[in-house]
């Protein structure tokens, strides 16, 4: 079935990037954007970092029941599109943000605004995320985006050439 292997590889790749960042910034904030019930932050815990899991309030409420926050971990209810959550992140030791399967639900302009806002608020921070090209987004739309009632995939975030498409966002 389409997607199972891709999801497993995505999680592996994102965890690799988070761990690589923590090697040079062991006390960094590890921020899971749109966390759902994902435990990548905990899986990458080096014993010194601070872990933040962000998602909508109803998701965080369920997460609190099933995956209570650990000692250096916070579950933060928020809308990622509202920058008020920036103030809740202690990035004094650096910050690595990751979004796993999240930006497919955002319009391109919303992703751009979020990325630019984060760049201003967290200088030197790193953002790791997955993205698909327009063809893959159309395939995804036939499966799980339909469940989310997303119809106009043409407006949603997709990347075919990261360097040429994302570099102008600086």
Regions found by a protein language model. Name each.
Residues 1-170:
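Alpha-helical subdomain
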């Amino acid at each position: 079935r389409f997607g199972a292997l891709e999801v497993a590889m995505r999680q592996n790749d994102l965890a690799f990037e988070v761990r690589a960042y923590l090697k040079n910034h062991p006390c960094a904030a590890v921020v899971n954007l749109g966390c759902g019930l994902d435990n990548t932050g905990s899986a990458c815990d080096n014993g010194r970092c601070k872990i933040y899991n962000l998602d909508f309030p109803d998701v965080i409420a369920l997460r609190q029941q099933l995956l209570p926050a650990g000692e250096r971990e916070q579950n933060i209810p928020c809308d990622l599109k509202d920058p008020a959550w920036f103030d809740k992140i202690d990035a004094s030791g650096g910050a690595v943000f990751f979004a796993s399967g999240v930006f497919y639900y955002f319009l391109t302009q919303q992703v751009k605004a979020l990325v630019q806002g984060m760049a201003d608020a967290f200088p030197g921070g790193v953002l790791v995320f997955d993205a698909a090209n327009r063809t893959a987004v159309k395939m995804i739309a036939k499966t799980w985006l339909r469940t989310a009632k997303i119809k106009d995939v043409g407006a949603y975030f997709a990347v075919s050439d990261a360097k040429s498409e994302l570099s102008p966002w600086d």
